[in-house]
Amino acid sequence: MASIPATVATVAQANMVAPFTGLKSNAAFPVTKKVNDFSTLPSNGGRVQCMKVWPPLGKKRYETLSYLPNLTESQLAKEVDYLLRNKWVPCLEFELEHGFVYRENARSPGYYDGRYWTMWKLPMFGCTDSAQVMKELQECKKEYPQAWIRIIGFDNVRQVQCISFIASKPDGF
């Protein structure tokens, strides 16, 4: 019996392709060196004289929208309408002592650093009108007049908080 040379390919070998088949070498492409020209970079040099720095003392900031003046009831309702349009679940949270991030039990960020506030009642699943949220906000303000109160928009599909802003602050803040 005559032996047949081992020319039968396995399935894995039959599907293999040589790497980079048909690519041209870099020598075929022209290379141009660009000179770094910094004369066309944007500049705000003329406007620096008009800029101001936000005073850091006595003006603590909280989170989204906190650099704006206090929002009116109608502005708050528009923000709530925005989160409802995005199909986020409104929630109210309040804090009685520390409206700012603080470190009480550890130096590193964690659960007890002032970012987690007490939730007012339950998340408002099924809420379709900003008036419902504003009514709950008024109830919370009536119950805790010296509390920081914020409104949160929670995406229950992605399980993330998408928006959070201060709705009410104690007097003097």
Swiss-Prot record:
Family of this protein: Belongs to the RuBisCO small chain family.
Gene encoding the protein: RBCS3
Any GO MF annotation of the entry: ribulose-bisphosphate carboxylase activity
Task of the protein: RuBisCO catalyzes two reactions: the carboxylation of D-ribulose 1,5-bisphosphate, the primary event in carbon dioxide fixation, as well as the oxidative fragmentation of the pentose substrate. Both reactions occur simultaneously and in competition at the same active site. Although the small subunit is not catalytic it is essential for maximal activity.
InterPro entries for the chain: RuBisCO_ssu, RuBisCO_ssu_dom, RuBisCO_ssu_N, RuBisCO_ssu_sf
CDD domains: RuBisCO_small
Misc: The basic functional RuBisCO is composed of a large chain homodimer in a 'head-to-tail' conformation. In form I RuBisCO this homodimer is arranged in a barrel-like tetramer with the small subunits forming a tetrameric 'cap' on each end of the 'barrel'.
GO biological process, one term: reductive pentose-phosphate cycle
Subunit structure: Heterohexadecamer of 8 large and 8 small subunits.
GO cellular component: chloroplast
Gene3D superfamilies associated with the record: Ribulose bisphosphate carboxylase, small subunit (3.30.190.10)
Organism: Flaveria pringlei
Keyword Amino-acid biosynthesis: no
Main location group: plastid
SUPFAM superfamilies: RuBisCO, small subunit
Transit peptide: 1-49
Subcellular location, record wording: Plastid, Chloroplast
Alphabetically ordered keywords of this record: Calvin cycle, Carbon dioxide fixation, Chloroplast, Photorespiration, Photosynthesis, Plastid, Transit peptide
Annotated protein name in UniProt: Ribulose bisphosphate carboxylase small subunit, chloroplastic 3
